[in-house]
Amino acid sequence: MGLNLKAPPGAASTAKAGGEAAASLLGTASGNEEPRLGAAMRELTRPSSNAGRMLMCAPAHYCVDYTINPWMENQIGKADNALAIRQWTNLARLLAREAELAFVAPAPGLPDMVFAANAGLAIGGTAVVSRFATKERQPEESLFHAWFEREGFKIAPWPRDMAFEGAGDALLDSSGSLIWCGHGWRSNPGAARLLETIFARRAVSLRLVDPRFYHLDTCFCPLADGWLLYYPPAFDAASRQAIAELVPAEKRIEVGEDDARLFACNAVEVNGRVFMNDASENLRRRLRAAGFEPILTDLSEFIKAGGAAKCLTLKLSET
């Protein structure tokens, strides 16, 4: 299948058809990667008629030059930007077969902006823009706010002093009636109650206890038809109990340490296909038995900064 990427109309910082807009989207990549990335993005601006929409941010400025999670330790200066661009483009091409992709322009000096899941949480035309816990990512907030505003989202007010890192720590279940909310490392535990009020649906707060899994989406992935892919040791006992009470045992796909470290739970599910960095054959077999098709795509350069497929995307059409 050919590429099916469409830029949303009316957004100055999103891709439009043609090379000029692609160059604007990408900003300035380093060295010889600028023409290569620009060419890829021109290809990724072809129209799509598929339902569903996701936000991504090109890795033109991606690197690891600070440490804000355990995955970044000893990785400063070691990320290969050229390889990251190829990996990100491969993911975008795969997703473009299933959904319409929108883009926010990357900004120099903000290497983690590529992790678009942390732009905010968007449900039914309303967006909550993230309030980052770490000073390194706080300059991203105004850029994401401007993007949501240009796209016509209603921006819900959010307290300046309440950390909330978007769809990294807030995930909608497949029924749309429940928001799973993570806290413990980045987002404030009070975020769940505010999200309940803003989006008029139940929010369940889950406490994360393993610093390697600092966002909910690194260890917890709601799938279609009420299925759940998750790593239980990332949660405290009360949170594991809450999950058990809300998700039937036969629909819980538990992953082990090895798969968790591969960021298997940091996956994106679209139309029954689960896009992920990697997974053991055992986990792939269990996903297939549940009716899902695992699609593996190497995202190892982004794991150096603590993210994979889910971190690189934000669903915009959830209701």
Residue ranges and their predicted role:
Residues 2-10, 18-19, 23-319:
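The feature marks the mature, well-folded catalytic cores of soluble enzymes
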